[in-house]
Amino acid sequence: MALVTTPTVNDGPLFAEVNMSSDFNAPTVRATVVQASTIFYDTPATLDKAERLLAEAASYGAQIVVFPEAFIGGYPRGSNFGVSIGNRTAKGKEDFRKYHSAAIDVPGPEVDRLAALAGKYKVYLVMGVIERDGYTLYCTVLFFGAQGRYLGKHRKLMPTALERIIWGFGDGSTIPVFETPIGKIGAAICWENKMPLLRTAMYAKGVEIYCAPTADSREVWQASMTHIALEGGCFVLSANQFCRRRDYPPPPEYVFEGTEENLTPDSVVCAGGSVIISPSGAVLAGPSYEGEALISADLDLGEIARAKFDFDVVGHYSRPEVLSLVVKDHPTNPVTFTSASTKIEDKTK
């Protein structure tokens, strides 16, 4: 297996390409994960950047392109939104107002644009966004088909730590796996990948291309991705941002609480680590920690059946009479309105 990195024009991102030997009886899919930074508080500029990266990936033949967690809208790394137990600051509330303003409605014009881009470049697009639903924000993944159609979304079920201050909780109605000509595609976001029951639900839906947009650049993340590939007998595509301090607004507009005084504009605040892993646990491309990059591998879909010959976690290796899972896949709304229709009889009859 040869790893080839090809510089792009204008010193842009690198495209790490893996040429795999392929079984001629099984289809091969070229997958790309994007490792790049949001343009914080500037959603139109971030969408423009997404288009440039998508066009570049498509020029190399990518059929599915996965962007990082919260790429549209931004991951507010280092911010505490002025929160301490029993207290919220005026600046923190203003920070939330700006963050809310940078989020997108689903459906909405930004979703329409992303769908059009997927169709223009003929790729399946998996995009991390901050979704605005009224005044609640969700960390969400959007799915788009290569024909230019919005397919659906997954809302992060469990935000981690202080994320719970700014993001709502998804429910069981948005755990989709989409059957497409290039395989069954699903996604889990960042640390919800550590939730065994969520993974099991996705395996039960037959996920073959398991997308894992994340904000975790630690080396230990690689162990989680390898485990999921082996456990699920699926390809794992994990995309993370690569960010320096200069990719965020300068202080005092934006402050990395507790570390700002130690940072320079060139300080790396998120080191990437984007990776593509096969169902056998082999690393096909990445992890990359050196800067913005497009990371690609050719996925031999025959690897899925070969992996599941030994271990099919919700098939021949399951014991449903001993261990089983119930998933509540209906929406959970805080308010339900019901209307009773009253039949008015014509008393003249």
Swiss-Prot record:
Disulfide bonds: none annotated. The keyword Amino-acid biosynthesis does not apply. Residues 29-301 form the CN hydrolase domain. GO terms for biological process: cyanide catabolic process; detoxification of nitrogen compound. It catalyses: L-asparagine = 3-cyano-L-alanine + H2O; 3-cyano-L-alanine + 2 H2O = L-aspartate + NH4(+). The active site is at E69 (proton acceptor), K156, C190 (nucleophile). Ubiquitous. Its EC number is 3.5.5.4, 4.2.1.65. It comes from the Eukaryota. Belongs to the carbon-nitrogen hydrolase superfamily. Nitrilase family. Involved in the cyanide detoxification pathway. Has nitrilase and nitrile-hydratase activity in the ratio 4.0:1, producing both asparagine and aspartic acid from beta-cyano-L-alanine (Ala(CN)). Can also use 3-phenylpropionitrile as substrate, but not indole-3-acetonitrile. This is Bifunctional nitrilase/nitrile hydratase NIT4A.
